[in-house]
Structure formats: C-alpha cells, structure tokens
Amino acid sequence: MKIGFTGIDMPEGKSKYNDLVLKALAEKDKPKKVSPFFVQFLKNEYVDCDAIVIHKDCLLDILILDMDKIESRINRIAEKDEIDLLNKCLLHLEKEEPLCTLTFNDAENKILKELSPPSYKPIIQIEGEYKINNIIEIALKETSNMFFYTSGAAESHAWLVPAGSDIVTCASKIHSDLARGFIKGDVV
C-alpha cells in the first residue's frame, strides 16, 4: 500500500505496521520468519498512492489541483454525461469538500478513475500529534482493506486483501495454485 502525504512532518519511505494480531500469532507459533505488512509513504505524491494523508490546513491545496484538472477536462470534452458529472464534482469541490466524500455510480467511477483527481482517493486529515500506526489503521479502513493471516513453524505472515474477501481471494494472495485448487472455506 502506498500513502501520499503533504503538509506534515513524517518519514518518507517504508514503514512497518505494528500488528498486534501478527505479533500474537508469532508468539504462539514461534516461526523462523515473521513477515509484517509495510506501507510506503510518498511525499507530495498523489497519483500512485492508495490514500492521501494531509494536514487539515492543506486540504485546499489538493482541492485546487482537482478543480484545475476538472476544469481543463471540461474544456476538452463534449459528452453531456461527463460534463454533468464534472460540474457536480466542481460544485462539491467549491464547498471545500474532497471528492471521496461523494457517492458515484459505476459509470461515474470509471470516468473519475481515468481522470484521477487526488481528492477522489481517500483523504485522511490530521492535525496535532499522530502516530504512524494510527495513520496506517485509518488508511486500511478508508481503502476498504483488511489482513489475512497465515502462521506456522516456518512463517507468520500478514497479507493485505480487500475487506470482505472470500477465502479463495485470500488464498490467491499466497499462491495462484492455492486459489485454483481451493474447495470450500470461510474467512473468520
């Protein structure tokens, strides 16, 4: 997972998530290897990230980027449905609200994913003291992700999967052959 950030003082690069569940599994199974989850923090990067962490005072900077991008797109297109969507987005941005707080249908989501305005991604606004682990937890929730764990004598591992994933999807994170050969199971 990649998290962009701006307006806050935090280290750029990879950060390990302090996962209490993985820690408990490792204490129980005493594996030779523990594979925790890492997040990559990217300073002032909005395109290649899954979520954006900003200081509350910097929200307008991102909204202005979105407005410029959307206004530029409106000037280049002629399809009424897309223009209506983009005008809806502009009105929302003018209220100083990020696009991630709006609900869109599948067709609108497709257009916005292609356009990729920064505030369409989950925005985590912070002020004052914060802990990196708390930011990661909020980002996981906002991006609708969860962990799938495997643990044994050889390794304890935290695998990132979309929230609500079935067992076959989780198994495919380990190896595609597991997903193909999986018969039945439940995520608990």
Residue ranges of predicted features:
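Generic alpha-helical segment signature
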Residues: N18, L63-D66, I132
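Residue-level detector of secondary-structure boundary/capping sites
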Residues: K16, D61, V161-P162
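C-terminal-of-GTPase-core extension/linker across diverse P-loop GTPases
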Residues: M1-P11, R76-V188
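Residue-level signature of catalytic and energy-coupling elements of molecular machines
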Residues: L25, I70, A171
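Conserved G1/Walker A P-loop phosphate-binding module
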Residues: M1-C58
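Switch/coupling subdomain of P-loop NTPase systems
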Residues: V47-A78
